[in-house]
Amino acid sequence: MEHYLSLFVKSIFIENLALSFFLGMCTFLAVSKKVKTAMGLGIAVVVVQAIAVPANNLVFTYVLKENALVQGMDLTFLGFITYIGVIAALVQILEMFLDRYVPSLYSALGIFLPLITVNCAIFGGVSFMVQREYNFPESVVYGVGSGISWALAIVLMAAIREKMKYSDVPPGLRGLGITFITAGLMALGFMSFSGISL
C-alpha cells in the first residue's frame, strides 16, 4: 500500500506532467484564463487519464507485448497508434457525455475538448506507464495521479492569471509573455519536490 501511495504522490508533485515534463502546454496556456474552465478541463483530463493509462496497460500487456497473443510475435511497434486510438475513443465518449449532460462546460471547453485526444500529457502518461513497466494496479494509481497533476497545474495557473488581470503588468509582457514567466516560476516551485525520495 505504501508503494502505491508514494507512486501517487510522486506522480502529482515530483513528476508533474505540466510543470516537470512540460507536456500539454498548448491547452495548458490556452484554457488557463478562467478557473472554472480550467477546472472543467482538468477534471476531463483526470477522467481520460485515469481510464486511458490502465486501458492501455491492458492493451499492451495482453495484445502488444512480446508473446502476448502468439508465441514469438512482438506487436510493440504498433504501440503509438494503438494508444492514440484508445485515447481518441475515450475522448469521444467523454465529449458525448459532456454535450448531453453538461452543455455549459462542453461549450466553454470548445475546441480544446477534442484536442485532449492529441494532448501530449495524456499520451505522455501512457508512454511513461509502458516505459516504466507498471502493472495494472500501478497504472491505475499513476493514471489518476498524473491526471490530477496536470489538473492541479492548470487550475493554479488559471487562479494566478485571474489575479494578474488586476496587476500592473508591463505592456510588453501582457498576455502570453507573463504567462510563460509564471509557468517557469511555477515549474521552479515544483522542481523543489524533485529532491524528495519516496
UniProtKB/Swiss-Prot annotation:
Membrane disposition: Multi-pass membrane protein
Domain of life the protein comes from: Bacteria
InterPro entries xref list: NqrDE/RnfAE, NqrDE/RnfAE_oxidrdctase, NqrE
Pfam families found in the cross-reference section: Rnf-Nqr
Subcellular location: Cell inner membrane
Gene Ontology MF, one: oxidoreductase activity, acting on NAD(P)H, quinone or similar compound as acceptor
Predominant subcellular localization, coarse grouping: membrane
Keywords annotated in UniProt: Cell inner membrane, Cell membrane, Ion transport, Membrane, NAD, Sodium, Sodium transport, Translocase, Transmembrane, Transmembrane helix, Transport, Ubiquinone
EC number: 7.2.1.1
Catalytic activities: a ubiquinone + n Na(+)(in) + NADH + H(+) = a ubiquinol + n Na(+)(out) + NAD(+)
Enzyme class: translocase
Example GO biological process: respiratory electron transport chain
Annotated Gene Ontology cellular component terms: Gram-negative-bacterium-type cell wall; plasma membrane
Transmembrane segments: 11-31, 40-60, 77-97, 110-130, 140-160, 176-196
Function text: NQR complex catalyzes the reduction of ubiquinone-1 to ubiquinol by two successive reactions, coupled with the transport of Na(+) ions from the cytoplasm to the periplasm. NqrA to NqrE are probably involved in the second step, the conversion of ubisemiquinone to ubiquinol.
Family matches, as NCBIfam families: nqrE
Homology family: Belongs to the NqrDE/RnfAE family.
Subunit-level organization: Composed of six subunits; NqrA, NqrB, NqrC, NqrD, NqrE and NqrF.
Protein name (database record): Na(+)-translocating NADH-quinone reductase subunit E
The organism of origin for this protein: Tolumonas auensis (strain DSM 9187 / NBRC 110442 / TA 4)
